[in-house]
Amino acid sequence: QRYNPYKYIELFLVVDNRMVTKYNGDLDKIKTRIYELVNILNEIYRPLYIRVALVGIEFWCNKDLINVKSASSVTLASFANWRESVLPNRTSHDNAQLLTAIVFNRGVIGSAYPAGMCDPNRSVGTVQDHSEINLQVAITMAHEIGHNLGMGHDNNSCTCGGYSCIMLPALSDQPSKYFSNCSYIQYRDFIMNQDPQCILNEPSGTDIVSPPVCGNDILEVGEECDCGCPRNCQDPCCNAATCKKYSWVQCESGECCDQCRFKGAGTECRRAMGDDPGGRCTGQSADCPRN
């Protein structure tokens, strides 16, 4: 079995009543915005080998199911308790974020528990819908999820190549999609020290609620493969432009498979040892025959 460097965050989003009202109850419009936010999240997290899969959206159309307060810490704690007691029984997920139209005190636009990823009570965040610009809100969500992944705020010694890094304490007027060197180190330390298990499993394509996006590195309904952008695709069997396997593909893995084709008949695939005479490919299968 090949080593898979990727981690997978199965994300559940809750839209509070104020945000539903802000969009005049147009849930389709909110969904479209959410799908765009998640696409940006995947762009941001791809360099860290993290894929974000949206596995659920809940709209609080009639009333909020928690007390959404302008004190961000109070709202975060209330949302965490609701999520722990209600959501696991309904939807398998790794992390939940509350999208809200409330204006938090002291200029706060989001909050999250540090290193909370995979914790039953702490794998949550809150994000204020503070801008009409998708990138601004997506970066805020990436920032809060970053806290869940063990990242702290950047200081003056942190850099991401001259850009305004994601984990700065305050959102820049010219935000970028880049994490700093400090964030990379803190994330690595979190993975090494906390060993969060919930982000190791790849979600099923049928669990993902957002429309399939060819090129996002996540296998979704209707796709035969998805190896990311064409320039980054490492899968020789996959047509990155269509997310379909090439018509000539015979195999993808196996002792008798090479570059998506069966190895020629007679090719040695298992050395002779003791009573085992070894094995040779048939030219018709990716598996090495067992005598």
UniProtKB/Swiss-Prot annotation:
| Co-factor binding details | Binds 1 zinc ion per subunit.
Q: Which GO terms describe its cellular component?
A: extracellular region; plasma membrane
Cofactor(s) of this protein: Zn(2+)
| Activity regulation (UniProt) | Inhibited by EDTA and EGTA, but not by cysteine or soybean trypsin inhibitor (SBTI).
Tissue note: Expressed by the venom gland.
Q: Which UniProt keywords apply?
A: Calcium, Disulfide bond, Fibrinogenolytic toxin, Fibrinolytic toxin, Glycoprotein, Hemorrhagic toxin, Hemostasis impairing toxin, Hydrolase, Metal-binding, Metalloprotease, Myotoxin, Protease, Pyrrolidone carboxylic acid, Secreted, Sialic acid, Toxin, Zinc
In which organism is this protein found? Agkistrodon bilineatus (Cantil)
- PTM comment for this protein? Glycosylated; glycans contain fucose, galactosamine, glucosamine, galactose, and mannose. Sialylated; 75% of the hemorrhagic activity of native bilitoxin-1 is lost upon removal of the sialic acid moieties of bilitoxin-1.
**Disintegrin domain ranges (all copies):** 211-291
Give the binding site residues for Zn(2+).
H143, H147, H153
Quote the record's binding site residues for Ca(2+) 1.
E10, D94, C198, N201
Instruction: Tell me the protein's name.
Output: Zinc metalloproteinase-disintegrin bilitoxin-1
Matching InterPro entries, A to Z? Answer: Disintegrin_CS (IPR018358), Disintegrin_dom (IPR001762), Disintegrin_dom_sf (IPR036436), MetalloPept_cat_dom_sf (IPR024079), Peptidase_M12B (IPR001590), Reprolysin_adamalysin (IPR034027)
- Description of how the protein assembles with itself and partners: Homodimer; disulfide-linked.
The entry's localization annotation reads: Secreted
